[in-house]
């Protein structure tokens, strides 16, 4: 059975192995054992309540319980930019006009921005390529919203997600070549790694403080502004079906889009509800425990021992019927409450 749970120290080796499969462009999961160990400790301290909001970050793992192996990760930063500045480019417009010459021209620009300071961020989503099936991707992504819904008080009024921008098969970023290289004089992979390991001072020191004219960039760089890496397209689609939208902010390194939404307007947060657990063995006559029913995200309400699974069922009343195996995976007993929501919006066919 596949289940999502909070990260534990014993997961370090599996996460390090996953980090080796990400490729260039995923700044939040570098293959650096010391950094990953510190990231795990920060998550554990977040759950223990010993960190300020600007330092808090939750890290979840997708575990194949049969193989006893972590095969995916996803995370939430509680409030970005409160300790270290949060940078992106805002895609804007400057107007150049002259009545004397009868000239009026609007010019697209890139402004260095800290506009998302204090927002909660969805990040560090990565699934082992061998497990990119059976709805594991949407499960690992959307379970974060179910956690936010259950513990809404810990998160901001807005949620954002930086999407990995376009790089070619050699890891080359056209946006970086046309923008970042001129200010940093280092390779994209190096800047990407430094940022991912928390060494971000160089961004503030070297990035331009004045708007950049998009028309001055190479054509291939202009073409990838707001575009995602092909491998990231499914993750973007998942978030967009939940209500997140591109509002004209892009990553300063690769030009990838930032998606955002009001937290309370995200479908999973808005539509999730609570049910009381009833435990019974599967019966072919049982309408509720049905392999052909709608697919649902189900999670317990335990903050420190959060667990979530996918299950097919029909909701007929305020109770949720679970098999003993599902109840054990969730860590719940009869009479406990769980939070549930359909994995996909009712009008979305999957």
From Swiss-Prot:
Gene Ontology molecular function: any one? arginine N-succinyltransferase activity
The record's active-site residues are 229 (proton donor)
Tell me its EC number(s), please: 2.3.1.109
Entry-linked SUPFAM superfamilies: Acyl-CoA N-acyltransferases (Nat) (SSF55729)
- Which pathway is this protein assigned to? Amino-acid degradation; L-arginine degradation via AST pathway; L-glutamate and succinate from L-arginine: step 1/5
Q: What NCBIfam families does this protein map onto?
A: arg_catab_AOST, arg_catab_AstA, PRK10456.1
Q: Which PANTHER family match?
A: ARGININE N-SUCCINYLTRANSFERASE (PTHR30420:SF1), N-SUCCINYLARGININE DIHYDROLASE (PTHR30420)
Sorted alphabetically, which HAMAP family does this protein's record hold?
Answer: AstA (MF_01171)
Q: What is this protein called?
A: Arginine N-succinyltransferase
Source organism: Yersinia pestis
**Gene coding for it:** astA
